[in-house]
Structures are given as structure tokens and as C-alpha cells.
Amino acid sequence: MSKIVKVLGREIIDSRGNPTVEAEVHLEGGFVGMAAAPSGASTGSREALELRDGDKSRFLGKGVLKALAAVNGPIADALVGKDAKDQATIDQIMIDLDGTENKSNFGANAILAVSLANAKAAAAAKGMPLYEHIAELNGTPGVFSMPLPMMNIINGGEHADNNVDIQEFMIQPVGAKTLKEAVRMGAEVFHNLAKVLKSKGYNTAVGDEGGFAPNLKSNAEALEVIAEAVAAAGYKLGTDITLAMDCAASEFYDAEKKEYNLKGEGRIFTSNGFSDFLEELTEKFPIVSIEDGLDESDWEGFAYQTEKLGKKIQIVGDDLFVTNTKILKRGIDNGIANSILIKFNQIGSLTETLAAIKMAKDAGYTAVISHRSGETEDATIADLAVGTAAGQIKTGSMSRSDRVAKYNQLIRIEEALGSRAPFNGLKEVKGQA
């Protein structure tokens, strides 16, 4: 009953008003899976390729008709008749057909949408929720946990039209006992942050990921206003709520001068100097996780940063590792960072995503499941986080339904699993157990 009878793709719109690929996989017995590919703004140079048409007369060149042609043509032809339950084979067929290292022939957006739709169809055929099917594919059947959210409540960098250089300032509701309580705490801090910003005369428009995007005097001020909001919500910073940052430092790195330029506050740093600056912030605020704290190619600098901060906090590689096992292995072998950010579309298939999570966990690294800044209502990452017991998730703030869809799916899953999916809070963060 899990034989594929039809594969089709369509062009839909993401949260930034750009087209993306949505795929459907139909099986015998009437089972259907549907999934959409997300899209990033600050992308790592080694990510799998997102195929765009480049035809300026349609969607300003961002159309995905070429990727759709791959889904509806060679991919569909190759997958019809195959068993959807054999995810690794389905993914390998598409990877081999594409024939490139970075999926540039069909596009990672085409392959990923079909890969995820296939997993959903197989779960339906097995009569089980997606998270349960993912746990089986992961070789960890019946092992679940609810992830600690990193909620991006102030947006800067490439995710906002403001003067804040650091891309994400996040809160983690570590004092919560359940995912549902964590969501409530996050929402309360978010609403109090709006009041704090308004009281200071700051704008409360939101960025791509639903966080506020004000012009601030400095990056440190972002942490200061969040601290005020936490207190106003009746919570204790460092006990109930901890902080995390995504610097996305590649976006303000000058490769020629080998300098990190925080234009918003008029400061320029060397590689080690920027790591020292981050260390100062961790001494002033309870920051327990820093992502992409240096440029993706600054491996020497990351070695220094990991040595300096890695015993105390979580050092997450996003653009650094791009969910790629070959690059992650190099990081593990050289003691670079201690955590990986997991984004489906950086690598382009579910099977390869699961391999990256496994490699990280086997090496004692944590894995943080993540959305992209361009999202849809597709909430597959919620099931991925629970089904792999990853322990942490980044899926934006408490506004924009493209973000909230993931939190709502997590609430539903927690309700269904009950005590089978513990919420471990701060213990999930590297260096905090």
C-alpha cells in the first residue's frame, strides 16, 4: 500500500512573497503527502543550490518553474512504482538523477519538497504521525523529546531593515516544565518587549521571523531591552529565561581586510577581537548559545572561539557546517564548535538531514533544528525535532503564522505524546547540563 503512483509539484508563495516549490506524493490506497521547501536570506556559500529561474519578467527572477519541471518530469518518472517507506532509496534516486554535488541540476528546493512529501505519505500509509515515522527512519523508534525553543524576538542583519548588525537575539524559556508553558512564557515576554520598545520611542514593526526590528543604539541594547521585557513579564533572567544569539557574522565580515564591521555601532574587530567582544556580552548577560559567531571560512578564528567559550556555552555552526556531514566531520575532527544548526534545505533531503543529526549526536555535539527566514505553513521541522529527540528548535518569534504554525504543531504533538516526550529545558543546551 506504500507504492508511489503519482508525484507532482506546484509553485506556491512563501512568507516573503517569493515563490517556492510544493510537492505532493500520492500512494496506492489514496495516501498523500504534501510538503514545501523553505528559503534562506543569509545563506552559507556551501549550501545545496536553491534553483531559481532568473527570468526577470516573472517574480523578479525568483520563479521556480525549472525546479518544478524536475519534479513533474524526471523525478516523477523515476519514483512512480517505488516504495515510499524506503526513504533512503527515494532520496538516493533523486540525488543520483541530479548528478551534482550541490543539487544544482534539479535544485535542492525540488528534491527536498519531494523528499519531505514522500515521508509524509509513507507515515500516512503506516497509519502513524510523521514524528513517529521519522523516529523509525532515524533508527530510534519510540524515542521522543520536546525541544527547547530559541525564540527570535529581536531581528537584525539580513532579516530586518534596521541598523542592528547581529541577526537574531533569542530567548529560551528554560524555566518551563512543558513545551506549552515555554510557548506561553515566550509570548508573555514578546508582548512585554513591545511595551518596552514603545516606551523608548522605538518602532515595533516585525522582521522576517516575527521578531521586532527597531533601530537601536548598539547590539548590547538589544539584550538590555530584552532583559527589561523579561523582568516586566515577571520572570527572572538567567533562571526562567536564558538568551541566545545568531550573529550571522559572514554578513558583516570583510574578507579582504579580515575584519568584522559592526556598522550599526561603528566598531571594527579582528577575528579574535570579535570573539573577545562576544565573551564580554556573555559575562554581562546570561547568553548560553551563540551561532555563527564568525565568518563561515574563519576556521582558525572558530578554533579560538571554541577554546575560549566552548566549555561555558553552546557554539553553533550554521553557515559554518550547512547541515553537511563532510564539513561537520572536519569540524568534529578539529574541535570546532560544539553544536550544529540543522536546516533541511541546506543539504536538500531528509535522509542526509538525519545523517547530519546522527553524526553530531555521536560526537557529543548538540543539534538545533531550524526554520529559514522564508517559510510557509509547512510545519515538518516540528515533527523532525520531536522524532529525532534533537532537544532544541529555532522557529522564530510569537508573530507571523508561518512561525506560529510550528509552535502550534509542537503543542499538538506534546498533547498526543504526553510523558513519552519529556521537555528537558536547559539540559539540552551544550555546556549547561
Swiss-Prot record:
GO terms for cellular component: cell surface; extracellular region; phosphopyruvate hydratase complex. It is found in: Cytoplasm; Secreted; Cell surface. Signal peptide: none annotated. GO terms for molecular function: magnesium ion binding; phosphopyruvate hydratase activity. InterPro entries: Enolase (IPR000941), Enolase-like_C_sf (IPR036849), Enolase-like_N (IPR029017), Enolase_C (IPR020810), Enolase_CS (IPR020809), Enolase_N (IPR020811). NCBIfam families: eno. Belongs to the enolase family. This is Enolase. The gene is eno.
